[in-house]
Amino acid sequence: MESEKNKPNIVFIMSDQQRYDTLECYGNDWINTPRLNELAKDSNVVENAYVTQPVCAPARSSIMTGLYPHTAGPTVNKIPLKEDVKTIAEIIDDNEYCNGYLGKWHLGDDTIKQRGFDEWVSVEDHYNSSYFNGELPYSDLHNWLINRGHKPDGYGPTGKEIFTDEGRSLLPEDSQMASFLSEKAEDFIDRNKENPFMLYVSTFEPHSPYAGPLDGMYDPESIPTGPTFLKKPDNVAEIDNARSDYHSSFINGADQRSDEYMNNYLAARGEDFSTREGWLKARADYFANITLVDRMVGRII
């Protein structure tokens, strides 16, 4: 993808919590991802890569800056990038490029255009670098969903109404974040196709909640599980076992946990993490969200 001025256009697409082994190029043959498969066949496929940090914001900071998290700033979530580090948009430093950021930021104030990007499309309302600087505007995704007739289902840290991840997963496919970002990416590319551009697209899917509009696409019982399915690792700390037991006790509206919100949500989705069948369904729904990502990639590329 190059502009008429022969400077390469850069399109960086990032999904959230997508395992490497969900792609055909890494041996997966049961998830329907034709666009990603075709892209991989015409690409360099990395077979020996390691994330700098397993936590969301620190890992994102490394991808965005090329630095280790302790240098970029975010060593845990909810810490913004340091002001003196450069993002990919600032590193390019070419006035002929139009730099666009679309999607989940998670490195500071999500709804504010910043860090060298000329265009900014936000998707989350409740990640602020500081809650002492006043209320930030709603995200572009929030306003888009409102215009489509949807209603917020929860509240952010400051009490304003928001679309929660759980509530958004109940919406139809054409109202999912991946579909929203597809639309915005197509518009960005169409408007900037005569000049060089760098476009960074960061979607939320297939991040939990694993349910979504394509639930039922895959038969839970027909998907391979492997020998470690539902097997706890050996020689781990007791705190890790306790955390696993806690999250595995959420079931369809049961009283095993006092977390009424989580139980009601899981009951509404028909999910049950206390049984083998429940975990199989969650895996199938997760894989369906990867197909949703694949459809987004197809529209962009």
Sequence positions of predicted segments:
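Formylglycine-dependent sulfatase
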Residues: 1-301
